[in-house]
């Protein structure tokens, strides 16, 4: 038996083939854009309008009729109109009976109404088969053809045959339909386009708080303190020096916070003796935001690298170097080469370079195009094993940078330690807790729990009852 080549099978239906008649209620931007796209894919389009005589700028080849006349032309009607105009459809109950009504509308706010637009439409037209679809596609994307970033179409409805017909239309348009179940999912589908970075809010807020706190903290130590004690103007540090302390500190803390929720979850499972209990909402949301926390941390690490690269061209640095050279020439004295200082300097630079390289690797593997090409074990190895190695290298980079100054009273300003000492608290705590959890006696118990073993049967009973200790 001969094997057929993949290129012998078309990915989408041939656009030259006649696909049937589809009716679109509404001649706005979305209705016209969707109609044009469907015409290009071989469909015959009939627009329904309140004023068919004055409708203009419609795709060539489309027919414009009144709502009742257009409804009689097709079994599938796409409602490209807002919810506020659904009441006008009550006059067309007889015309819409048995038809497939595709609701593409969105609201202005999340959960604006008690029920979804699709469910509201189903109440108005009980004899029709309402399907929610195409609300995640913009009119601009349909017109320009840039559908790569929004190719997925969520579809839901109570009638499986009606859903299948709508999904066939989506495939013909080159889209990827995803069946979301019954019409009860319409509310979630309608809320999806209205979300504004839901998983990024916590990382942004947290990073903003950390940046502001450490910026003010460093400004007190490095700008306000010298001015109060010696009338020295060090405000120039606000542009480069202080941000170049704040950015790596924020990056290190955020990186540690990526792995802290996993440790807390392990401790919680050990305490409960079972995995069949939901985590607290705050911990659950924190774990869902780990990827975003890591990417924000990578962004701050990038800023640290860029700010470090511009250090040699700063006026302050060039002035110090020039002044030191002139002073040595006038006094005829040179500074001795100290091998230990060279080791410390090169070590913290090497640790920083290696840490940033692995940080980049973590960021690259978190991209969907890359993560989809590796299996779960490979992804877990990179994000977990190499992730902790990255945290170790970045923490060691900061420790070596501090050197002996940790124990020196001279770094205190108004009894305030250097900012990098505060930055090491969370990363060191995470690494210490991780070392405890990987001890054989603890790791063996944790592995058994995650494989389904339970220490006490009462946890199973309370889990079934939906109770929580925390």
UniProtKB/Swiss-Prot annotation:
Keywords: Cell membrane, Copper, Endosome, FAD, Flavoprotein, Golgi apparatus, Heme, Ion transport, Iron, Iron transport, Membrane, Metal-binding, NADP, Oxidoreductase, Transmembrane, Transmembrane helix, Transport. The keyword Protein transport does not apply. Induction: By Tnfa (TNF-alpha), by Il6 in white and brown adipose tissue, and IL1B in white adipose tissue. Tnfa, Il6 and Il1b shows sinergistic stimulatory effects. One of its GO terms (cellular component) is plasma membrane. InterPro entries: Fe3_Rdtase_TM_dom, NAD(P)-bd_dom_sf, P5C_Rdtase_cat_N, STEAP_metalloreductase. GO terms for molecular function: cupric reductase (NADH) activity; electron transfer activity; FAD binding; ferric-chelate reductase (NADPH) activity; heme binding; metal ion binding. FAD binds at residues 140, 148, 269, 290, 366, 383. Heme b binds at residues 304, 397. Gene3D superfamilies: NAD(P)-binding Rossmann-like Domain. This is Metalloreductase STEAP4. Belongs to the STEAP family. Its EC number is 1.16.1.-. The chain crosses the membrane at residues 202-224, 236-256, 293-313, 342-362, 381-401, 419-439.
